């Protein structure tokens, strides 16, 4: 392999893409790797939140698609590897395959959650699909989708080695409102109000400098709105360190919830989208949970009653989920208060997260497995 077109689109996928690029260069010395960045598009440009935000920038996304299709035609890579970001990336992978170029997609589209009618189209668009979760290949034809293990599993100690051994600061709360600007504006104000008046300290790891600037603006608005604001440390990066240090976290749905899970950090998962998107989501999505640790837990405890009883604040799952109208200041505050005041609850949450993440492990190096599917 001499040329690899490697396309992510959002920062969460770009993290894996950088590792894939590094491993490809180790396994195939001299390979040239290009991505969206070489054609003038950054993750900040591409990461758009919400139906209306996409619609408002539809001409930009059409330009991205035309530019990348032209790049495939002119540069003629030996393989195209797309990472997550399925709305754009699966179209580009299908285009590459139609030109006789090997196309591999990393991160399974969530067909187990909604719109299973896409499965034949996905199978026709790709040569291989690399999955991070053990239950995903069963939705596709034999030999097409492969469980490679989750890359995060290799970066954290196995669950049995750390179960119940967290030494987090009992008053430190990590707040992660998401990496997109729309998420920060829509979610962070609720998280900040939830900690107003609590005896705690907060850390907010931003995905990048642009996100940090937006977070700092929201924090200043919050401080100006009243008293009782605990200390807040806003930093670029450092999410994993924050999860290791914190007693608990409030995290917007996404890759950060998995990092919290692998760190065994007691977590309340929060998310809220616009009314139109929520309307369609309620009619299309076929699963009870959005947190991947909870989904893996449920798949591997099928037939059990995971309710945990009325006395279990986590409802029998590894993570508490507060979505849409449940994502209120009152509910988030209660969840954080429960975690910082109850050592036993934190231990229960950590143990369940350890068990759930152990199920995402497999023998060998997931990134090397992905690279080998490219040839």
Task: Walk through the language-model features, giving the residues of each.
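Nucleotide-activated sugar donor-binding and catalytic core shared by glycosyltransferases
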Residues: 1-375
């Amino acid at each position: 392999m001499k040329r690899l077109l490697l396309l992510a689109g959002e920062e969460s996928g770009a993290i894996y893409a950088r590792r894939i690029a590094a491993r490809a260069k180790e396994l195939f010395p001299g390979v040239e790797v290009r991505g969206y960045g070489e054609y003038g598009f950054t993750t900040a440009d591409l990461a758009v939140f919400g139906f209306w935000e996409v619609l408002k920038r539809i001409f930009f996304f059409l330009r991205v698609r035309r530019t990348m299709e032209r790049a495939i035609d002119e540069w003629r890579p030996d393989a195209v590897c797309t990472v997550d970001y399925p709305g754009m990336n699966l179209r580009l992978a299908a285009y590459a395959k139609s030109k006789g170029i090997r196309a591999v997609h990393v991160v399974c589209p969530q067909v187990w959650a909604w719109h299973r009618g896409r499965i034949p189209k996905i199978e026709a668009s790709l040569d291989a699909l690399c999955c991070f979760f053990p239950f995903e290949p069963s939705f596709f034809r034999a030999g097409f989708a492969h469980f490679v293990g989750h890359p995060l599993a290799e970066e954290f100690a196995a669950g049995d080695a750390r179960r119940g051994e967290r030494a987090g600061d009992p008053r430190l709360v990590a707040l992660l409102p998401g990496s997109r600007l729309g998420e920060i504006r829509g979610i962070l104000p609720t998280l900040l109000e939830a900690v107003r008046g609590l005896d705690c300290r907060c850390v907010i790891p931003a995905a990048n400098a642009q996100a940090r600037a937006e977070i700092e603006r929201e924090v200043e608005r919050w401080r100006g709105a009243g008293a009782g604001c605990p200390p807040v440390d806003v930093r670029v990066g450092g999410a994993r360190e924050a999860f290791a240090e914190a007693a608990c976290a409030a995290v917007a749905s996404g890759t950060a919830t998995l990092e919290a899970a692998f760190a065994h950090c007691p977590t309340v998962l929060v998310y809220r989208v616009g009314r139109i998107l929520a309307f369609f989501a309620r009619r299309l999505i076929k699963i009870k949970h959005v947190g991947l640790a909870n989904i893996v837990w449920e798949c591997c405890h099928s037939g059990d009653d995971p309710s945990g009883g009325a006395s279990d604040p986590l409802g029998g799952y590894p993570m508490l989920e507060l979505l849409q109208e449940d994502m209120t200041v009152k509910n988030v505050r209660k969840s954080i208060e429960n975690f910082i005041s109850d050592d036993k609850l934190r231990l229960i949450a950590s143990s369940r997260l350890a068990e759930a993440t152990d199920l995402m492990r497999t023998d060998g190096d997931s990134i090397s497995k992905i690279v080998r599917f490219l040839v």
